[in-house]
């Protein structure tokens, strides 16, 4: 039986951590973790014709990510990451290779075969990549999961962009801090966080809305009314880079493989906890599988 196909659209880059550089970019982090959870993953992005670009593609291939990555004359993307108690702050270099992803029929054909697509706001910050990604989203097949992780960074977003991307999505992931901003931006009626998530579901006809609360909880609401809430297990944190993306990729891979909402949610929480114990967004998975931190916490 063939594996489901997952495609990530947007940034591929180096996270320049205090301990050294690590391959990353939210959509590609997603693709990596989907590939570790029963999916065949591809990244659509761009790197520069430079040493960093060649090294980045090599790392992606070694990690099991198939790349549909263009090479252009702009520098490969980098992000300076400062860590405070393991929590990252990002300084994102502008006008880099992934700001110049060009549309091709080959990319459109790949997207048309995907069972799931992942995208966020950052990858569309430039007009060129915005136009390409929007055009590619128009080629998704019926029934595909279209995962929009809002993933707000710096000032690289607007209400118009968020509305546009929600119009293409059927899964929406947002964290509790971002939800506060979205309440004001969209003038969401007063109510608890779950009601605010349901507001997005109703307005944009979403299949799932995912709300994460970092070190405390996560809630997933399905269109049919099923809800799953899990507390975040406590682990010794190396850094949280890519943890949210690992949650998303794991959840999507499991759903595509036939897992129930609760099964997929549990796998996502355990995966994110595991990633927090490692440096960078693409840690190797244990041969025996990710530990069941939730089971350990329940004892």
Which sequence ranges carry the predicted segments?
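Glycine-rich phosphate/adenosyl-contacting loop at the front of the ribokinase-like
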Residues: 1-65, 79, 236
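Conserved phosphate-binding/catalytic region of the ribokinase-like
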Residues: 1-4, 190-299
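Proline-centered loop/turn at the N-terminus of a beta-strand
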Residues: 5, 145, 171, 207-208
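Short, conserved phosphate/pyrophosphate- and ester-handling motifs at nucleotide-, phospho-/glycolipid
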Residues: 34, 175, 244
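Conserved N-terminal subdomain of the carbohydrate kinase-like
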Residues: 40-121, 293-299
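Structural alpha-helical scaffold elements that stabilize or flank donor/cofactor-binding regions
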Residues: 109-110, 164-165, 202
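Conserved beta-alpha-beta core of the PfkB/ribokinase-like small-molecule kinase fold
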Residues: 116, 121-195, 217
């Amino acid at each position: 039986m063939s594996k489901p196909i997952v495609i990530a659209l947007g940034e591929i880059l180096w996270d320049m951590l205090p301990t050294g550089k690590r391959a990353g970019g939210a959509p590609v982090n997603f693709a990596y973790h989907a590939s570790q959870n029963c999916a065949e993953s591809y990244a659509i992005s761009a790197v520069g014709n430079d040493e960093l670009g060649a090294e980045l593609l090599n790392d992606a291939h070694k990690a099991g990510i198939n790349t549909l990555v263009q090479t252009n004359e702009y520098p490969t993307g980098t992000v300076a990451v400062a860590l405070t108690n393991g929590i990252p702050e990002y300084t994102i270099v502008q006008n880099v290779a992934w700001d110049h992803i060009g549309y091709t029929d080959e990319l459109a054909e790949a997207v048309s075969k995907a069972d799931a697509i992942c995208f966020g706001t950052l990858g569309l910050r430039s007009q060129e990549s915005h136009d390409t990604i929007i055009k590619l989203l128009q080629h998704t097949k019926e029934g595909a999961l279209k995962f929009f992780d809002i993933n707000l960074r710096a000032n690289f977003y607007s209400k118009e962009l968020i509305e546009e991307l929600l119009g293409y999505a059927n899964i929406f992931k947002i964290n509790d801090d971002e939800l506060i901003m979205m309440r004001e931006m969209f003038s969401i009626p007063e109510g608890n966080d779950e009601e605010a998530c349901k507001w997005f579901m109703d307005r944009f006809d979403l299949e799932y809305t995912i709300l994460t609360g970092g070190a405390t909880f996560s809630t997933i609401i399905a269109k049919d009314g099923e809800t799953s809430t899990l507390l975040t297990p406590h682990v010794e944190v190396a850094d949280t880079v890519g943890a949210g993306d690992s949650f998303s990729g794991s959840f999507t891979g499991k759903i595509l493989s036939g897992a129930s909402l609760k099964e997929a949610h549990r796998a996502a929480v355990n995966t994110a906890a595991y990633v927090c114990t490692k440096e960078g967004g693409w840690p190797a998975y244990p041969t025996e599988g990710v530990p069941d931190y939730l089971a350990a916490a329940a004892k």
